[in-house]
Amino acid sequence: MNTNQIILTDQGDNYVNLWSHVAQDLYNHYGETLYNSWFSKVNFIESSLNTVILCAPTNFVRDWIKSKYSMVILQLFQHYNNTIKSIDIITKELPGTTQTVIELPTKTFADIGSSELNSENIFSTLDVRFTFDNFVVGAPNELAYAAARAVAESSGAVSESNPLFLYGGVGLGKTHLMHAIGWYIKQNNPSRKVIYMSAEKFMYQFVKALRNKEVILFKEKFRSVDVLMIDDIQFICGKDSTQEEFFHTFNTLIDNNRQMVISCDRSPSDLDNIEDRIKSRLGWGLVADVHSTTYELRLGILESKIEQMNVKIPKDVIDFLASKIVSNVRELEGALNKVIAHSNFTLKEITLENTQNILRDLLRSNERIITVEDIQKKVASRYNIKLSDMSSSRRLREVARPRQIAMYLSKALTLKSLADIGKKFGKKDHTTVMYAIKKVEELLENDIELREEINLLMKILQH
């Protein structure tokens, strides 16, 4: 970030230029994922009495930025111009923009008794583990979390995020958020009628209704709810009759100001074998990408899970899991459960070595192959020592400590035995490697700076 003050007048063009500097700083600080979620569609409007006025695309985005980022944005503005005392964020139509209003045909539906709706109890299909309280929020999923929370808290009014379309890879938290919406509504607005089900089950119930000549009951059931949540909508791709029924259900609910939440493994525009009119409607509201997890988010998820389970796991094991199980949250939690279960059944202590052995097969499928040589090169470069120092016997601290760190990382990031690692470090025996690992583990207990340094090296080596 430029450390020089930019002296500005009240001319709009200058403030637009200033906002571009602030936006770039936000991008640099928070990264592409979070920037695209919140700031990319924010525009400068005007300045008045030392106040900069920005425009957000929706009330939802405006409120989230105000609550989470307003002070950071103000400080960035003041960095460039210290006469700015405050910022305000509004929502309004920008000059020169137009909105297309699509009129949906008005439909009516019969009011059916609660016993009919309750024949399928939503809460029997919700997982008690999946609530907002135990959803770990990070940059990759912040937009999706905030949108899901807004839908749940809408208290009967339809949110701006209608439909809310959540998409991303398997095991990243989409289903968790949908269940969390259901539980929140049950606890805070129990009179609201909610249906949650997979697209596959939606199709099977529709086919059953056709076979039993109960299509009218099917339509009434799904079109008389306050919130309809359909998981894995990609399942109806290529299924024309189900798509047709979903299309009319969607239209009826949206036309009657009912909330829809939909999940998918890809964005609406990337769906194949689905009608264009459905693609278009899926993108009407808020489309939120649940991105792949970062190391920090995986670490937070593990720590939260460990706290819930009230177990003790060594720090090096937690760091190892967060570094190695990168595919999705489901596999990450599964790996943790497997390690804990193995310890409970065998009465063996949870150690890094045991963890590596227990998860050997899973690690192979997740792991980019990292060699001891890769680690030696990265560590030598990081600490500005010669690569040959890794296999030397020099005892100078500036050489010995990086060598110990490289041995520690070799054990953490490869499946090599201590003896094999020792051979790569100038034919040292396994006791020397063991001493180095224990030394680093002891230092990690209290040395926060070293812990951050090793975490950084792990991330560099993983990607």
From Swiss-Prot:
Residues 1-83 are annotated as: Domain I, interacts with DnaA modulators. Residues 344-463 are annotated as: Domain IV, binds dsDNA. Residues 83-124 are annotated as: Domain II. The keyword Nucleotide-binding applies. One of its GO terms (molecular function) is ATP hydrolysis activity. ATP binds at G171, G173, K174, T175. Keywords: ATP-binding, Cytoplasm, DNA replication, DNA-binding, Lipid-binding, Nucleotide-binding. The keyword Nuclease does not apply. Transmembrane segments: none annotated. GO terms for biological process: DNA replication initiation; regulation of DNA replication. Residues 125-343 are annotated as: Domain III, AAA+ region. One of its GO terms (cellular component) is cytoplasm. It is found in: Cytoplasm. InterPro entries: AAA+_ATPase (IPR003593), Chromosome_initiator_DnaA (IPR001957), Chromosome_initiator_DnaA-like (IPR020591), Chromosome_initiator_DnaA_CS (IPR018312), DnaA_C (IPR013159), DnaA_dom (IPR013317), DnaA_N_dom (IPR024633), DnaA_N_sf (IPR038454). Belongs to the DnaA family. Plays an essential role in the initiation and regulation of chromosomal replication. ATP-DnaA binds to the origin of replication (oriC) to initiate formation of the DNA replication initiation complex once per cell cycle. Binds the DnaA box (a 9 base pair repeat at the origin) and separates the double-stranded (ds)DNA. Forms a right-handed helical filament on oriC DNA; dsDNA binds to the exterior of the filament while single-stranded (ss)DNA is stabiized in the filament's interior. Oligomerizes as a right-handed, spiral filament on DNA at oriC. NCBIfam families: DnaA. This is Chromosomal replication initiator protein DnaA.
